[in-house]
């Protein structure tokens, strides 16, 4: 290369510039694909953490760093409260491709090497940046793919408009389309390390845990379960607690301790890890054994259920932090009274339904003992229904799951909840006959003794609990104060406050 004064030095050092592309973290526009998993405010907090971390890394590399955000001048003070940039630039263009091209075109000069990257990469490292600039010495374009089929970094020595004119930027064909354009233009390119761009809840979980192959297993109002593969490709469960039914601040720790206490039962999931300090994830979580099986069939699997419950109830336990209710009937009644108040105070109550509820409450109030001593204390689930069982090919290959509300109590409470009509009817249309209940208890008694009188008292209270909960939920769903997940749920709740159902279970309160 020749200049006015003759030949330039053999090594010509290009100026290395970094363009950091980011959104202004705002609720409603930031990480919106995470809103089915976390609150908008939490999504903003995650974006801010990633922006701070990645800006700090890039600022330490002694390159020219230019921050382009999607806001305007009014957003600069807020952005400055997050990162100490001397100046901000504004993204402009009709789409993401236009915005990236315009940014590179505006800052690149002869002799520059420019890379542009997003701000929310979980695994950004100095090596990624170093390799990008190094390879720009020998190729036209460098690319770092993201795991979702797109890319998070692109670098070049001159702006090339066609590279950014892709059909779309919102699907898994982005990288493929980009490479096609590059090849058609006869450009040389280098593909670097893959980055994790956090867009979905699976991305967030992978960034937090390092686990791979994360897939949703099941979600409820209080917990969300995912499967993942560990380093040895063994399938496990990641369980996240989002809210506590027991109003506990340490809900996931409580369930983890329960699983530890029950691990020798051989019929519950083995717990692995408990994580309470997280970097990005706003929830605590535990990992546990993945178990195969189907839901319990009340007509075919009662022998297995008797065996499983006895294994749980017969498990010896050491000193622990599980809640032990000294007078469970008083606590159950208080809970039921509070739930029933929601319906009984409703201006749209059905007078006849309210009459049934008051009758049931009155009967249970009479049955509350002044003093009560738990006999033969054991670990109980307290919420057993057909969905709490995973039935395999045999009783030894079957399990009891979901231990978020375990207590130290009496086996009769578990048995009564499991057999109560308000339980069996919830996920099925089955109400066990008196003979079927007695047959199950006979099978259970082959493994463990139970007290018939205590069982019958618990049975009545569990019927009350089911009815009062449904009456409360019926009002909440009717007023749209509770998110309705599906029509089946509302129809089932409605059936629990129907005259026919209430009359059918009123025999338990005679």
Q: What is each residue range found by the language model?
A:
Residues 413-449, 462-480:
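Active-site activation/catalytic loop segments of kinase-like enzymes and analogous catalytic loops
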Residues 124-148:
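Conserved donor-nucleotide/metal-binding helix-loop-beta segment in metal-dependent transferases, i.e.
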Residues 209-211, 317-382, 386, 392:
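An alpha-helical support segment within catalytic cores of ATP-dependent transferases
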Residues 26-27, 31, 243, 277, ...:
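A glycine-centered beta->alpha junction motif in the catalytic cores
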Residues 14-34:
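N-terminal nucleotide-binding beta1-loop-alpha1 segment
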Residues 468-510:
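ATP/Mg2+ or Mg2+-diphosphate-binding catalytic cores
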Residues 221-334, 374:
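ATP-binding pocket architecture of kinase catalytic cores
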Residues 217-229, 237-238, 365-413:
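Active-site acidic catalytic loop and adjacent metal/ATP-binding pocket
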């Amino acid at each position: 290369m020749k200049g006015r004064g003759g030949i330039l030095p053999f090594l010509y050092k290009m100026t290395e510039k970094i363009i950091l592309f980011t959104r202004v973290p705002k609720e409603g526009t930031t990480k919106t694909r995470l809103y089915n998993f976390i609150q908008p405010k939490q999504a903003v907090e995650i974006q801010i953490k990633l922006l701070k971390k990645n800006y700090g890394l890039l600022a330490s590399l002694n390159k020219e760093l230019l921050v382009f955000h999607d806001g305007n001048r009014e957003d600069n003070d807020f952005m400055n409260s997050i990162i100490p940039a001397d100046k901000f630039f504004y993204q402009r263009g009709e789409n993401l491709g236009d915005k990236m091209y315009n940014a590179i075109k505006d800052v690149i000069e002869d002799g520059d090497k420019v890379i542009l990257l997003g701000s929310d990469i979980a695994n950004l490292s100095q090596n990624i940046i170093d390799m990008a600039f190094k390879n720009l010495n020998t190729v036209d374009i460098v690319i770092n793919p993201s795991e979702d089929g797109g890319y998070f970094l692109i670098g070049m020595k001159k702006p090339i408009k066609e590279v950014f004119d892709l059909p779309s930027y919102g699907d898994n064909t982005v990288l493929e389309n980009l490479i096609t354009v590059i090849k058609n233009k006869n450009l040389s390119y280098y593909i670097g390390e893959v980055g994790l761009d956090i867009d979905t809840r699976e991305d967030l979980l992978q960034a937090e845990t390092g686990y791979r192959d994360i897939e949703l297993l099941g979600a409820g109002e209080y917990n969300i379960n995912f499967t993942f593969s560990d380093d040895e490709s063994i399938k496990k469960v990641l369980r996240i607690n989002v809210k506590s039914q027991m109003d506990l601040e340490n809900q996931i720790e409580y369930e983890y301790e329960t699983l530890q206490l029950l691990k020798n039962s051989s019929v519950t999931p083995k717990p692995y890890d408990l994580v309470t300090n997280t970097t990005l994830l706003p929830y605590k979580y535990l990992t546990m054994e993945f178990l195969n099986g189907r839901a319990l069939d009340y007509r075919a699997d009662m022998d297995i259920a008797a065996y499983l419950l006895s294994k749980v109830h017969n498990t010896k336990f050491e000193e622990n932090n599980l809640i032990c209710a000294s007078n469970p009937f008083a606590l159950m009644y208080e809970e039921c009274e509070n739930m029933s108040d929601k319906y009984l105070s409703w201006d749209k109550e059905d007078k006849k339904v309210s009459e049934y509820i008051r009758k049931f409450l009155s009967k249970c109030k009479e049955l509350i003992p002044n003093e009560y001593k738990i006999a033969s204390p054991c670990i109980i689930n307290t919420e057993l229904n057909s969905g709490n069982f995973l039935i395999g090919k045999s009783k030894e290959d079957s399990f009891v799951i979901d231990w978020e509300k375990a207590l130290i109590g009496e086996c009769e409470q578990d048995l009564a909840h499991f057999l109560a009509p308000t339980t069996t009817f919830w996920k099925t249309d089955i109400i066990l006959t008196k003979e079927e209940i007695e047959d199950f208890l006979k099978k259970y008694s082959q493994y463990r003794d139970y007290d018939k009188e205590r069982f019958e008292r618990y049975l009545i209270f569990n019927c009350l609990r089911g009815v009062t909960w449904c009456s409360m939920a019926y009002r909440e769903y009717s007023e749209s104060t509770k998110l309705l997940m599906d029509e089946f749920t509302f129809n089932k709740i409605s059936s629990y406050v129907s005259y026919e159902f209430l009359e059918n279970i009123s025999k338990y309160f005679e």
